[in-house]
Amino acid sequence: MNPQKIAVLGPGSWGTALSQVLNDNGHEVRIWGNNPEQMAEINEKHTNTRYFKDVVLDEKIKAFDRLDLALEDVDAILFVVPTKVTRLVAKQVAEVLKHKVHILHASKGLEQGTHERISTILEEEIPAQLRGEIVVVSGPSHAEETIVRDITLISAASKDHDEAKYAQAIFSNDYFRLYTNTDVIGVETAGALKNIIAVGAGALHGLGFGDNAKAAIITRGLAEITRLGVAMGAEPLTYSGLSGVGDLIVTGTSIHSRNWRAGDALGRGEKLADIEKNMGMVIEGVSTTKAAFELAQQLGIDMPITETIYKVLYENLDAKTGILDIMRRETRAENEFINNK
């Protein structure tokens, strides 16, 4: 593939790591963010110390605080902004974009209020004549590992397989490998909903529970994710792949995961407001829990773990009490997880 001009919208940890991958592959990378000081740091010092203290970026990676300049003559746009601002940024893109491009996103969440997936938001806000089918880039990936070029395998999903193959081509190299998929709903919901389970897994650790309990929440959490995803139109098999169980394992077991760390702090008795302030980064699992709980209620899907985490986050339920409530639920067969509502 010829070198591409790619705008990466969002200078957070994952946006920065993906920018480096694309730069390593010979593409012209333009990072866009709305903090002029952060953009100046990337351009002048080739660092992004808010997220990576000891990483020096290639000087060819350029940063912009003007969206119109970042998008000038680009071949592709990669959204890596928090879910809560995706619609706003997409509207801004639609206002200044002058030509058709590939649209990809690597964000994980559901929009509060509408409960919509990221790709749906992008489809609604960016006119069809300016884009192809949206590509979702998602899977088991810690930015802290990708930025040091540790081996990472994830999925690229689009309703148009050629668009997924485009993402595969621009990203894949010796340490970063993409597999294509056409189940956009499955890949997106898996990436969003696993953050909820990661909060729960962290809470178990903070409460002092052992590996048995952590394995249980991951596997039963996967059952919940699959139930809701299938009700939304996803393929069940997707949840056994990289974007499903793979992402759930890496997010639900690692201190690199901000969602896991948030849950751990909750389990140790810290208040959510203090946790969010101390972390200084978006904890997608918190807002996604609310959206998923409301969506499950709307669709009539049984999600006891999600419901419990919702009550801990939004109704001040004691975390240990919530766990005991789950353990006291009526017993049932394990494999009722897809069709049982």
From Swiss-Prot:
Residue pairs linked by disulfide bridges in the UniProt entry: none
In which domain of life is the source organism classified?
Bacteria
An individual GO BP term:
phospholipid biosynthetic process
Q: Which UniProt keywords apply?
A: Cytoplasm, Lipid biosynthesis, Lipid metabolism, NAD, NADP, Nucleotide-binding, Oxidoreductase, Phospholipid biosynthesis, Phospholipid metabolism
One cellular component term (GO) for this entry is: cytosol
Active-site residues, record numbering mapped to chain: K194
Keyword DNA-binding in the entry? The reply is no
> Where NADPH is bound, by residue?
S13, W14, K108, A143, R258, V282, E284
Tell me the SUPFAM superfamilies matching this sequence: 6-phosphogluconate dehydrogenase C-terminal domain-like, NAD(P)-binding Rossmann-fold domains
Annotated positions binding sn-glycerol 3-phosphate: K108, G139, S141, K194, D247, S257, R258, N259
Q: Name one GO molecular function term.
A: NAD binding
Pathway of this protein? Membrane lipid metabolism; glycerophospholipid metabolism
InterPro entries hit by this protein: 6-PGluconate_DH-like_C_sf, 6PGD_dom2, G3P_DH_NAD-dep, G3P_DH_NAD-dep_C, G3P_DH_NAD-dep_N, NAD(P)-bd_dom_sf
- State a single Pfam family of this protein: NAD_Gly3P_dh_N
Q: What class of enzyme is it?
A: oxidoreductase
Compartments annotated for it: namely: Cytoplasm
Give the E.C. number(s): 1.1.1.94
Which reactions is this enzyme annotated as catalysing?
Answer: sn-glycerol 3-phosphate + NAD(+) = dihydroxyacetone phosphate + NADH + H(+); sn-glycerol 3-phosphate + NADP(+) = dihydroxyacetone phosphate + NADPH + H(+)
Record carries keyword Oxidoreductase:
yes
Q: Kindly report the protein's main subcellular placement as a broad class.
A: cytoplasm
Per the entry, what this protein does is: Catalyzes the reduction of the glycolytic intermediate dihydroxyacetone phosphate (DHAP) to sn-glycerol 3-phosphate (G3P), the key precursor for phospholipid synthesis.
Q: Which family does it belong to?
A: Belongs to the NAD-dependent glycerol-3-phosphate dehydrogenase family.
Name of the protein: Glycerol-3-phosphate dehydrogenase [NAD(P)+]
Mind giving the lineage of the organism this protein is from? Bacteria, Bacillati, Bacillota, Bacilli, Lactobacillales
Q: Which gene encodes it?
A: gpsA
